[in-house]
From Swiss-Prot:
Taxonomic source organism: Bacillus subtilis (strain 168)
GO biological process: asparaginyl-tRNA aminoacylation
Similarity comment: family membership: Belongs to the class-II aminoacyl-tRNA synthetase family.
Protein name: Asparagine--tRNA ligase
Keyword Nucleotide-binding: yes
Highest rank taxon of the organism: Bacteria
Underlying gene: asnS
One term under GO cellular component: cytoplasm
Catalytic activity: tRNA(Asn) + L-asparagine + ATP = L-asparaginyl-tRNA(Asn) + AMP + diphosphate + H(+)
Keyword Endoplasmic reticulum set for record: no
EC numbers for this chain: 6.1.1.22
InterPro entries in the record: Aa-tRNA-synt_II (IPR004364), aa-tRNA-synth_II (IPR006195), aa-tRNA-synth_II/BPL/LPL (IPR045864), Asn-tRNA-ligase (IPR004522), Asp/Asn-tRNA-synth_IIb (IPR002312), NA-bd_OB-fold (IPR012340), NA-bd_OB_tRNA (IPR004365)
Keywords tagged on the record: Aminoacyl-tRNA synthetase, ATP-binding, Cytoplasm, Ligase, Nucleotide-binding, Protein biosynthesis
Assembly information from the UniProt record: Homodimer.
Gene3D superfamilies: Bira Bifunctional Protein, Domain 2, Nucleic acid-binding proteins
Length: 430
């Protein structure tokens, strides 16, 4: 019976056939141990010389790393295995013998591994991170579908920048200039006026010359927008969503978290509601902690975010930032025009901001005024401003960076491990 590694639990005591690759091997005299992977998981195949034909045992001893094969054996329970099962091998059929596989079971430098990213993905650690990434994506769709959101796909080629920044990848669009999207937010606001509650999931591109462990040039974002939703309700959606995906990973990725050595006790504490502090309170807190490099009106750096997050040891919202620090589309607070109704969600354990969100401006005159203040071409944003002309309502939204979220939940030290083929400063290969 042909099966996959993640389904062997259904076949205890039965003989099965699995198509797999040899991840590693070792032998001790009359027994050979093959670490096998098939994309769904890892299992150990045990080949006992006295129980198989001599040719099969010799194949098991000589088979090379990453050789592909069909392997037949009897599924047995094994408490020592992370999977809980092993395969008592009865037959091996080599499909293709791999030679000189470059990523041997020794330590390799980061640049070497990045040059061989197409092969590094096969490792047990990278496999675990990709499975966690997949579970976060799956749980994202489940959460927003359950909450009545409609999936909308904004364009990747745009004629303007949502953030109003210069960190854009430009290209020619026939006789016009176009840019790779930094965010689908403006289009999602239009969709929310048609469909009520919407979300998008797609790639974004930022030409930031940054080499930190938190930054990628190309990354994926989840961007919900909601009509008739004001600031506080927006925060509630965010904390419920983050709590949901964390609990989903804890439930469905136990083997992967164990493979990564992730301390799940910290993740188990991630449940809504999350603490909230204002920007003013954050500045005061940092000064009390001895940070003398920040004043009101300054943005937070990684050390500042880490200090704040460590104090709470769970995700924390920093709210009501100065207007001068944020994009043009954010709604000002009713009691203070110098701050806006926005929040950044800071992940614990030093992973920094994973969500940025706000209530959006819904008054057309105010929006047009903000566009002028930011020096933006009003003609390029005419369609966006027009959303406030025909039945405008309070509305809010946010964007969650997938790779930073994967890094936090999986415990990865750098976001380059959280996307299959990372695009970094000075790295476009493979």
């Amino acid at each position: 019976m042909k099966t996959t590694i993640n389904q062997v639990y259904k076949h205890v005591g039965e003989e099965v056939t699995i198509g797999a690759w040899v991840a590693n091997k070792r032998s001790s005299g009359k027994i050979a141990f093959l670490q096998l992977r098939d994309g769904t998981g890892f299992i150990q195949g045990v080949v006992v010389k006295a129980e198989v034909e001599e040719s099969i045992f010799q194949t098991a001893k000589s088979v090379t790393q990453e050789t592909s094969l069909y392997i037949k054996g009897i599924v047995k329970e094994d408490e020592r295995s992370p999977l809980g099962y092993e395969l008592a091998v009865t037959d091996i059929e080599v499909i293709h013998e791999a030679t000189d596989y470059p990523i041997t079971p020794k330590e390799h430098g980061t640049e070497f591994l990045m040059d061989h990213r197409h092969l590094w993905l096969r490792s047990k650690r990278q496999h675990a991170i990709m499975k966690i990434r997949n579970e976060i994506i799956r749980a994202t769709y489940e959460f927003f579908n359950n909450e009545g959101f409609v999936k909308v796909d904004p364009p990747i080629l745009t004629g303007s920048a949502p953030e109003g920044t210069t960190e854009l990848f430009a290209t020619k669009y026939f006789d016009e200039d176009a840019y790779l999207s930094q965010s689908g937010q403006l289009y999602m606001e239009a969709a929310a006026m048609a469909l009520g509650k919407v979300f998008s999931f797609g790639p974004t591109f930022r030409a930031e010359k940054s080499k930190t462990k938190r930054h990628l040039i190309e990354f994926w974002m989840i961007e919900p927008e909601m009509a008739f939703v004001e600031f506080e309700e927006n925060l509630q959606v965010q904390e419920n969503y983050v709590s949901f995906i964390v609990q989903s990973v804890l439930k469905n990725c136990k083997i992967e978290l164990n493979t990564l050595g992730r301390d799940t006790s910290k993740l188990e504490q991630i449940k809504a509601p999350f603490p909230r502090i204002t920007y003013d309170e954050a500045i005061e807190f940092l000064k009390e902690k001895g940070f003398d490099d920040i004043e009101w009106g300054d943005d937070f750096g990684a050390p500042h975010e880490t200090a704040i997050a460590e104090h709470y040891d769970k995700p924390v919202f920093i709210t009501r930032y100065p207007t001068s620090l944020k994009p043009f589309y954010m709604q000002p607070a009713s009691d203070r025009e110098d701050v806006v109704l926005c929040a950044d969600l800071i992940a614990p354990e030093g992973y920094g901001e994973i969500i940025g969100g706000s209530e959006r401006i819904h008054d057309m005159e105010l929006l047009e005024s903000r566009l002028k203040e930011h020096g933006l071409d009003s003609d390029a944003y005419k369609w966006y401003a027009e959303l406030r002309k025909y039945g405008s309502v309070p509305h809010s939204g946010f964007g969650l960076g997938l790779e930073r979220t994967v890094a936090w939940i999986s415990g990865a030290p750098h976001v380059r491990e959280t996307i299959p083929f990372p695009r970094l400063l000075n790295r476009l290969y493979p």
